[in-house]
Amino acid sequence: MHTVSRLLAALCIAALALSGVAGTAAAQSAADGQFVVELDADGDANATFSDEFDLSDPDEREVFERADSNAELRATAAERFGEEMRLVSRTANEALDRELRVGDVTVETAVVGETGVVAYEFRWENVAAVDDERVVLAEPFSLFESLDRELVVVAPEGYAIESVSPEPARAEGDTVAWPGLTTFGEEFEVVAVPDSGGTTEPIEHSRAGTTHGGAPLALGISALVLGSLLVGRKR
């Protein structure tokens, strides 16, 4: 991808996937990065959406260094990303009896070996439902067919994952993860319960996870961020 286009996609400043060419490219392979949701017992979460750059590639290094050195660009990216995540939350709120809210977004950069990381961090209020002591994450991920990068969900401190759908590619203690482009849809759900401290029971999986083999269109609800964030919104 052209350097400027790569920068705009990574920093969520311009449209990415609503054109035919970009939509096809986004669908062919998962993006390098993660969406990490670290849940709290009250249903809030610390969320981090990251994009990764191969610093051994001159074009990608240039993009990362521009992001790393330009505070104004990072601030604009944080503002735009926050707007789009609030739009995601408002869409979910239409069908819920609780209100998802997105706090201020900060953009951080880091270098890990030969990888540059641009991370958007924010507080996500009420993203999970709380039923007695059960913490259930479904919306907004259940409203979309897939996510373009790895999704990682971490149970609240002192909790364990009781059940999850679809079956995760990784399940390690209080953490489950799916690779990018795994099919989610309305069956997506992660249930966490207080850890009894006894023998850990196997996590229940309601169905196997699959990844898209074709090229689904990127139909984000906005032309700014969701073309690269949420792929194939259900109608």
Language model: regions and residue ranges:
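Hydrophobic residues positioned within well-ordered beta-strands of beta-sheet architectures
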Residues: 33-35, 45-49, 118-120, 149-151, ...
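Structured domain cores in non-transmembrane regions
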Residues: 57-122
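Hydrophobic alpha-helical segments
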Residues: 1-31, 153, 203-235
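Generic beta-strand hydrophobic packing signal
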Residues: 33-35, 105, 164
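Intrinsically disordered, low-complexity linkers and stems that provide flexible hinges
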Residues: 108-111, 123-207
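Solvent-exposed loop and beta-edge segments used for protein-protein assembly and interaction
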Residues: 29, 39-45, 110-116, 143-147, ...
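Short, solvent-exposed secondary-structure boundary motifs
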Residues: 23-29, 91-101, 158-160
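N-terminal pre-first-transmembrane soluble regions of secretory-pathway and organelle membrane proteins
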Residues: 1-84
